[in-house]
Amino acid sequence: MSNLKQEKPDSYKTLAIYQKSECIYDVTYHFVNNFLNKSKDRTVDQMVQAARSCKQNIVEGYSDAEGSSESEHKLSVIAKGSLEELKEDYRDYLRNNNLEIWGVNHPKYIAAQPLCKIHNDSEWYRRQIAGRNAEDICNIALIIINQELTMLYGYIKYLNEKFLKEGGIKEQRYKTRLEWRKNNLGY
């Protein structure tokens, strides 16, 4: 029966991919509440929902993984799609407000990127963005979104490879049942 038992962390909260998604949600929540007009701008709800969707789909995919590798994969892809949408909203804001999108050679990008890479604590981000301008917050959000996307692409690739090697839950259960029947019933 060991085929069915998979080693997983005790909680999704210990996963870097979840922790970074929580940071993205908190940065986005701060940004829309401080720089967008909630009563006139539909982007507020769309950005918050995209950030929330990423985080919640990671949670649901992790929880569903025990019963369905297909659900885990599908929800991870949805989380990635939500982040791509959110990334475009931040880029649109910067472009439409004539603000700079930091390239990889921009001094602020060079300073922020390695810090964002090592921090997955949303409290750290809340402290870092307090009092910053919209351009800085958007670019910090873009950095952590790109880092999260890199993790999600890697995770989805891992899930695809795992499926090719092990099959889905139904295949694993069927194989385990056949092994049990062979060992216990002789056929």
Q: PLM features: what roles do these ranges have?
A:
Residues 1-187:
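Amphipathic alpha-helical assembly/interaction segments
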